[in-house]
């Protein structure tokens, strides 16, 4: 009898552990579908009215952090959604703002000069900031340049915020779609001809991420409608830090 009880307890514990490891991104997906339009602009006032739902999702992220048993796609989807959800939450915490960079001017924390350095995130008991997620985790652990088209820093010149969350089972296709969306948006990247282009500053800031195995032109040609020639003349567009908000 005791052996049966022990077996049942062990089985329930196993199922409990599996349940804890599963994170549903559906609540965030519902928020994005409701408050982000097709161009990626955000209704921050609307999300603010349902901030409890966003906070509930963030609580799930805090308590169900990636485990070694997770697949790479499960981990990466988690961290991309976490970055975007926490960025929205940061905007709401200081709303109204004209730019996310205005938050850096508002805060009075020693040695913290930008909104990306504010330790307002707590995952697995560890305090972290948006830079920790992007540079310390995502760029460090995943050799995936397309993340630059998925992480959205709440600015007009950032890649558009997709009106859906990222899910492990569709992650590869979603990242490719985000890359194509970004490179075919003439306000972000202007391909004048096969010999000349004005690109987003993202390709200047993170050029090394895109050129580990190929040239920048060859990387762009995988997702752009215009095929750049080798040694094309490339310039970089000014970055618009205005808030990506619906008017």
Residue map of PLM features:
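Bacterial Sec-dependent N-terminal signal peptides
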Residues: 1-21
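Interaction/scaffold regions that mediate signaling and macromolecular assembly across diverse proteins
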Residues: 21-247
């Amino acid at each position: 009898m005791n052996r049966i009880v022990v077996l049942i307890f062990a089985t329930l514990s196993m199922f409990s552990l599996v349940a804890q490891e599963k994170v549903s991104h559906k609540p965030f997906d519902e928020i994005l579908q409701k408050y982000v339009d097709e161009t990626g602009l955000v209704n921050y006032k609307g999300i603010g009215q349902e901030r409890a739902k966003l906070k509930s999702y963030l609580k799930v992220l805090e308590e169900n952090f990636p485990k070694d048993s997770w697949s790479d796609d499960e981990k990466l989807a988690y961290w991309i959604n976490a970055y975007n959800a926490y960025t929205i939450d940061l905007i709401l915490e200081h709303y109204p703002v004209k730019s996310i960079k205005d938050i850096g001017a508002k805060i009075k924390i020693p040695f913290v000069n930008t909104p990306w350095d504010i330790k307002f995130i707590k995952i697995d008991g560890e305090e972290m900031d948006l830079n920790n997620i992007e540079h310390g985790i995502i760029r460090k652990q995943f050799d995936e340049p397309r993340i630059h088209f998925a992480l959205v820093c709440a600015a007009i010149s950032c890649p558009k915020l997709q009106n859906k969350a990222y899910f492990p089972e569709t992650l590869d296709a979603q990242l490719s779609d985000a890359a194509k969306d970004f490179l075919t948006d003439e306000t972000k990247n202007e391909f004048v001809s096969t010999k000349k282009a004005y690109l987003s500053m993202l390709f200047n800031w993170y050029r090394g991420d895109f050129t580990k195995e190929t040239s920048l032109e060859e990387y762009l040609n995988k997702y752009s409608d215009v095929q750049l020639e080798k040694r094309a003349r490339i310039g970089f567009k000014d970055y618009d830090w205005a808030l990506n908000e619906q008017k």
